[in-house]
């Protein structure tokens, strides 16, 4: 759910901000660079200390952080695509900005957006599992892999599966998202 929101909002805002001249608003770009330099884990710490630890707080914190990074990615890619010959030809032929964004630019950056979403899904899983492992779980009654690993540590000698199986599932889940992202990256680009 969080990755779908990241992708949708990030693509829309990134396309809107990236159209036109690159670097036209230096202040906005500086602010965007500053907020994307903050790691997602820092957003998570700030949100948890402000609103308490719950599922919604963790998802919102990671989603906000990743939306900002997606906006920066899509904005940069949009600015790069706008300078290419096929977009200049579309502008010269009288195509509207909406048509240029939808038909010419979006297909060329969608793979990067999907790749980023796959990698960010793995990052969300690792962050939430890590925070649950150190005791900042998702709340009472919510079971997740990080808290399962943390609770299983005390009986690791007697039942190592209580730690190893959740760790294996974290590993496999993150690996599958990373492999999916790599496969999308290897797919190449679409030249319109």
Set out the residue ranges of the language-model regions:
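C-terminal transmembrane helix and the adjacent membrane-cytosol boundary/short C-terminal tail
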Residues: 64-65, 111, 117-118, 160-192
